[in-house]
Structures are given as structure tokens and as C-alpha cells.
Amino acid sequence: VKLWGVLVAAAERAYSTDLNRARRDLWKQLVWKVEKRERRDITLDEAKSISTFVNNSSGRIGSKGAMGTVAVGLNQVLWSTQLQLSRIRMLTGSSMWTASPAARRLIAGQYIRMLGSIGAIIGVGLLLGGDWEEDPRSGAIGKLRFGRLRLDVFAGIPQYIALAVRVIYGEQKTQQGAIIPTRGDVPFNQRGVASILGHFLWSKLAPIPGGTISAFAGENVIGQPFTPWDMLR
């Protein structure tokens, strides 16, 4: 058991090191692009804006500031709080809000490149016989489908669109393709707004609180049978 713990810790360090190296390399490349395009040295604020974008695009928001402190504290309750907040930031484009025009153009260009790459993946998937869900009322929005296989090519970002649409617009699309209301006359055995919000939060809980709820409910977040003994596996 001790050896297994050492191996897991080493693998975690190796993963973090490689990911941080990739972040550094991308940051240096984007800084070089700004300096080459603008023919001047990059400013500190521009460097910070690019750093924010690089962190957000790779699943982090940083550990400094009020948001970072809150994210670290919430890790005891929510699974990978930094990742979840970074998905929201990528969706809203927050790294461009206070950026200089030069940094904003660069970051916007990166968004366009990412969308182009994702579009190419979706195109290939469709050519290979897959389906792509484009209805924002569906929980599978943005995903490629190959039978029972789902590929989340947008890295978890569209789930927040689906949640907002279901809550605000008041409709959802089931796995069978039916459009049903989430407010008012909700069909039997279907989720209303309160249940949708609760289930979404349940799906974002850390293993211990999430497993505790699953043990009391008798099933996990995807509806599979779950007992207290399953938490010990």
C-alpha cells in the first residue's frame, strides 16, 4: 500500500510538471506573437492577461486572489473547483474583459483557432457516421455520438449552457429526443428546475460528499445502484 501511494504521488507530480511546462511554452509563444505583431516589448498587464487565458484554457484559474482562495477551500466539497471555474471563464471569455487591444486580439484569435480545430473534429466525426448534438436544451449539447459513445469535444464547457437554458428557458430535451417542460406541468419521473439544479450540483461534488449522498440515495449520480460498501472500493 505504501509503495502504491508513492507511485501515485510520483505520477501526480509528473503530470503537474508536464502540464505546467506546456502552460509555460504556450505563454512564451503567445507573448512572442504579441511582441512581433506590435513591434514592442509586452507590458505587464498584457502578460497577465495572456497568463490568465493560458491558465483558463488548461483548467486553472490560479491560486492567488479571492477567487483562487475560494477555489482552494471548495476543493473539499466540489470536485476540481479550479477546472469548473475555468470552464465558466472560457465560456464567458473573461480573460479578454480587461485586456489591452493587442492582448484581446491575440486571445480572440486563439478562440477562433480552437473553434476551427473543434469544427474539424466534428466534421470528421460526422463523416465517420457520428451524430452531433446542437440543441442547447440537451445535456449532450456539443458532444459527438457514436452509438452509446459520447465524445465531449468542447471539454465540458457546453454543460453550463445546457443548465442555463433548462433553468431560464424552461425546456429540456430528453435522451429520446422529446422536448419537455422543466417548469409548471413537468411530466412524471422527469426533472424540474429544482431537481436539475440539485442533480447538477451532485455531479460536481468531491468523491467523499458525493459518495455519501449516493450511499443515502441508493444510487450514484448516473442512476447506477450504490451502497455504503461501494465507497470503500
Task: Go through each PLM region and give its residues.
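Amphipathic interfacial helices
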Residues: 1-233
